[in-house]
Amino acid sequence: MKKLLLLTSVLAWISGASAEEKPKLIVGVVISHFYPEWMDMYGNELSENGLKRVMKQGARVNVNYNYFYTQTGVDHASIYTGMLPTEHGIVSRAWYDRLRRKRQYSTQSDRYTEIGDQQADSIKSLSPDYLQTMSLGSAMKWNNPMSRVFSVAMNGDEAVLSGGSSADMAIWFSEKTGKWVSSSYYCSELPEWLRMYNTWVESDHFVNKGWMMLSDEDKSAARIRLTNHFYYDIARAKKEYNTYRVLKATPYANTLVRVLAEKLIDEERLGVDNDPDLLALNFSCLDYMSRDFTIDSSEEKDMLVRLDMDIAALVSKLDARVGKGNYTLFVTFSEMRELMPEDLRKIKVNSDYFSIFKAVALLKSYLGLVYGPGDWISDYDQGQIYLNRELIEQKKINLKEMQDKVADFMIEFEGVAKVMTAYSLTHTSFPEGVNRLVQNSFSHKRSGDVFFCIHPTWVSE
């Protein structure tokens, strides 16, 4: 298995164990859409016990993802397997299943049901069935069957793919109930401690609290509105949209994960013996915040300060419960935060949004003119276009020819920097550059027929 460090973007870890000693507990923290420059911008606002401690007491490694499509799930599978998407199989958040003629999400499963919600018996749930290789948790259990593996996230994809195929349980947040749920892939029901934990819906506390700057928490909403500071009425938003999803775009999402993780460490007795355990945590509120706020906004700054507090609280818990020198903590980032056109235009950088929906609508019209009426496109998503191969075969059209025509058409759109076909990716070995990155994300069975990359300063809608 390749080294775990290979695919991480920025990694730091702290451990008091010597090279000859095994840690009793490994804790992985993956933060989505983090902007590293925040550490310089707001470093004075952070405590010495959170991210600064991780950086100072641990080792820091700067490396780059060596594949093209960094997305939720893809990155988590890559981090915890140490392999490329072309190897572990999670090539995208979703792909088109040609045999079943429908879109397949990376962890979606018809074989299992959701557990943790009394009304969820018939709700289809998630599983790591599409993960094609061993992950860190699987390797740990292979070496020591007594090892325990758990993962916690607000999103099911992150929890499932971080834990891997051999996890004792992956736990994620229910947008419907505000409680923690899992899948019958792992067990028939939640453990007693988690069922009891769910009886008090902690998320309601944060919903009713609202979101304001940390320094304003002792002020009323009316007083906050008299200042230039922000206040978000989460309870009103939840009532309007009838979902706990509104919490995911607040720093409270990270806190919910951290608090549950601390409870899990106690109840499952992680790190108490010489059988090393794994706890994979995912902090993903920035995934929902990044397109709503600029990188220098008060909201993003408040998120960073609160994230730092969560990291500090987690490390303090590990010190007290597992003991200094008995655990290893690593922190890494997935899905680097996009610089939005609104940010870049301030410094006169050419930037805009690329609409795949408009592009595909024009592409369909073009293919209709060239090849006649027909549903020539089966699906499209995240820089990939899937052609209707069954129709192409029926009409006795050369697949490579149509792939080339689609590529020639797509490259003409403003904002598109490069286009590649599945034929070129399967018949050519690219040693470097963007072509190599795309090839590392390519699966002959799961990827599309045509791939396109937009300019670095553009953003897909």
Regions found by a protein language model. Name each.
Residues 84, 90-275, 284-291, 411-418:
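His/Asp/Glu-rich, glycine-adjacent segments
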Residues 62, 69-71, 93-123, 165, ...:
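Secreted, luminal/periplasmic, and some membrane-associated catalytic domains
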Residues 1-22:
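Bacterial Sec-dependent N-terminal signal peptides
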Residues 22-27, 57-61, 87, 145-149, ...:
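Loop/turn elements at helix/coil->beta-strand transitions in domains of secreted/extracellular proteins
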Residues 23-35, 54, 79, 140, ...:
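Beta-strand elements within well-structured catalytic alpha/beta cores of enzymes
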Residues 35-41, 64-66, 122-127, 244-251, ...:
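Second-shell loop/turn segments in exported
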Residues 40-88, 148-152:
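Short, structured active-site-proximal loop/turn typified by the sulfatase FGly-forming signature C/S-X-P-X-R
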Residues 34-35, 47-51, 75-79, 132-136, ...:
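Stable alpha-helical elements in mature extracytoplasmic
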